[in-house]
């Protein structure tokens, strides 16, 4: 049964860093990513171009109307906390508009952090599965390496995404 398959997480707060906090971000997802109107976004938009509803402060001008406007892409999108990691840890107090020379790298780093957060989410889910005790030290090691990539831009640059994917798949 499902109840027998899962156990309590080692630390219930480990998932906290995977919770989006748009108020602590600068709307990077609304700029860095490609949007398609057919997928429930307000417009067809190329990656690197700001959404037409993104305000200067990084917040959405129509956030309170997303449901009414049936913008399911916006409603369902979850960066798993990548936005706030980039804006608070890797590029603190850096608004992409104020630093056009860093814009491309910042957007690229956002995508990389998002992918690392996805790996992190799956690894944390594995720690809650019964029968994974033999793999716990490998899981913990990989989780710590991913978290250390978020210390600064240099650490993220040195983190091999393909290596992390490969190691996570082996576990």
Positions of predicted regions on the chain:
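Short loop/turn segments that flank or connect secondary-structure elements
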Residues: 2-171
């Amino acid at each position: 049964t499902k109840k027998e398959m899962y156990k309590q997480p080692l630390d219930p707060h480990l998932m906290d860093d995977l919770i989006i906090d748009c108020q602590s971000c600068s709307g990077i997802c609304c700029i860095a990513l490609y949007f398609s109107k057919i997928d429930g976004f307000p417009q067809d938009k190329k990656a690197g171009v700001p959404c037409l509803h993104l305000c200067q402060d990084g917040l959405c001008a129509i956030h309170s109307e997303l449901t009414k406007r049936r913008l399911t892409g916006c409603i369902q999108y979850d960066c798993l906390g990548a936005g706030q990691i980039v804006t608070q840890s890797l590029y603190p107090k850096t608004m992409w508009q104020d630093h056009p020379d860093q814009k491309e790298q910042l957007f690229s780093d956002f995508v990389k952090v998002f992918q690392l957060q996805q790996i992190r989410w799956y690894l944390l889910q594995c720690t809650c599965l019964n029968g994974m005790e033999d793999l716990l030290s490998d899981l913990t090691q990989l989780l710590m390496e991913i978290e250390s990539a978020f210390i600064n831009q240099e650490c993220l640059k040195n983190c091999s995404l393909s290596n992390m994917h490969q190691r996570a798949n082996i576990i």
